[in-house]
Swiss-Prot record:
Pfam family, one: Cytochrom_B_C
Binding-site residues for heme b b562, renumbered to this chain: 75, 174
GO terms under biological process: mitochondrial electron transport, ubiquinol to cytochrome c
Protein's job: Component of the ubiquinol-cytochrome c reductase complex (complex III or cytochrome b-c1 complex) that is part of the mitochondrial respiratory chain. The b-c1 complex mediates electron transfer from ubiquinol to cytochrome c. Contributes to the generation of a proton gradient across the mitochondrial membrane that is then used for ATP synthesis.
Species of origin: Python molurus
Cofactor: heme b
Family: Belongs to the cytochrome b family.
UniProt entry tagged with the keyword Transmembrane helix: yes
Location within or outside the cell: Mitochondrion inner membrane
Binding site for heme b b566: 89, 188
Gene transcribed to yield this protein: MT-CYB
Cofactor binding: number and manner: Binds 2 heme b groups non-covalently.
Name of protein: Cytochrome b
Miscellaneous section: Heme 1 (or BL or b562) is low-potential and absorbs at about 562 nm, and heme 2 (or BH or b566) is high-potential and absorbs at about 566 nm.
Length: 371
């Protein structure tokens, strides 16, 4: 074994020749994670987890700290980039049947849940108006849990309402969870390379593999450069594009915003929650919108691994993508017609995709005459 065995390990890692640019998003997610930890640390150094000082400390960071505005914007926009990359990464996994590598898929979905929790805690920290009310609405869903709901909510809040203890514990969780994400990411990568990446054809790539470096590393580097360029353009010219106007006002428990909504990357789940007029039903649908991803490896019935040769599944997949976009858009609108019916239809279509996949697999097996 050579001295620089870790570098050699990555350099000589055998990878399928035909993996496309859709396989680049894993390394981009790793870069996003590194950026978030780095910028997050410098922000935490200047942040004060106190309900009277949190909002002022964010203003202090953006105005007085050298390059604080850049750190703050990179951290906020980096979170959006993180979710763009992870949603594309999951979509690629769904399309090309990567979920059949069960351990990797399960660890990946667990990572997604941890990431969503981290992002939610982070959204509360600026203690702006939308931060406060989004936290109130989402954490209040715990009261829908039978018997234990009220106790759980009081325990999470650290009192009978969202207050100073809530902000302190959310900051502590937002700081510690990224380290759990780093550990789980390492596990995810180890589990992936035990079997190796899938490929667009879904065939066994053992007969045709090339070293990861330089062939795929340069391809990854290109997309990484484009992502960083895209981020820097947003930071420099449109830094508030993902921000909610209400969040520029300090949290006021006495004034409710006209339309409470979380960050854009939670809107699909929030749209599903809002589409059900029952509190417990909505909370269950919200949880199931993510948890349903766990069952996918066990409902695969097609003999072909990817959707490359499965036209009906392709149709359903692109319906899911358009449903995801539509429900995200509908969740930004007030709860009134026609947005209520749009949310309900798209929420139903979202779950139909996962329910219909095994049935479509059997139909496609008949179409292709595979036993």
């Amino acid at each position: 074994m050579p001295h620089h065995y870790i570098l050699t390990l990555f350099g000589l890692l055998p990878v399928a020749t035909n993996i496309s640019t859709w396989w680049n998003f894993g390394s981009m997610l790793l870069a996003c994670l590194a950026l978030q930890v780095l910028t997050g640390f410098f922000l935490a150094v200047h942040y004060t987890a106190n309900i009277n000082l949190a909002f002022s400390s964010i203003i202090h960071i953006t105005r007085d700290v050298p390059y604080g505005w850049m750190m703050q914007n990179l951290h906020a926009i980096g979170a959006s980039m993180f979710f763009i990359c992870i949603y594309i990464h999951i979509a690629r996994g769904l399309y090309y049947g990567s979920y059949l590598n069960k351990e990797t898929w399960m660890s990946g979905i667990t990572l997604l849940i941890t990431l969503m929790a981290t992002a939610f805690f982070g959204y509360v920290l600026p203690w702006g108006q939308m931060s406060f009310w989004a936290a109130t609405v989402i954490t209040n869903l715990l009261t829908a849990v039978p018997y234990l709901g009220t106790t759980l909510t009081t325990w999470l809040w650290g009192g009978f309402a969202i207050n100073d203890p809530t902000l302190t514990r959310f900051f502590a969780l937002h700081f510690i969870l990224p380290f759990a994400i780093i550990s789980m990411s390492s596990l995810h990568i180890i589990l992936l390379h035990e079997e190796g990446s899938s490929n667009p054809l879904g065939t066994n790539p053992d007969i045709d593999k090339i070293p990861f470096h330089p062939y795929h590393s340069y391809k990854d580097l290109l997309f990484l450069t484009l992502m960083i360029l895209f981020m820097l353009i947003i930071v420099s010219f449109f830094p508030d594009i993902f921000n909610d106007p209400d969040n520029f006002s300090k949290a006021n428990p006495l004034v409710t915003p006209q339309h409470i909504k979380p960050e854009w990357y939670f809107l699909f789940a929030y749209g599903i929650l809002r589409s059900i007029p029952n509190k417990l039903g909505g909370a269950l649908a919200l949880v199931m919108s993510i948890m349903i991803l766990f069952i996918i490896p066990f409902t695969h019935t097609a003999h072909f691994r990817p959707m490359t040769f499965r036209p009906l599944s392709q149709l359903m997949f692109w319906t899911l993508v358009s449903t995801f976009i539509t429900i995200t858009w509908a969740a930004t609108k007030p709860v009134e017609p026609p947005y209520i019916i749009i949310s309900q239809v798209t929420a139903t279509l979202y779950f139909i995709f996962f329910i219909s996949m095994p049935l479509l697999g059997w139909i496609e097996n008949k179409m292709t005459n595979t036993p």
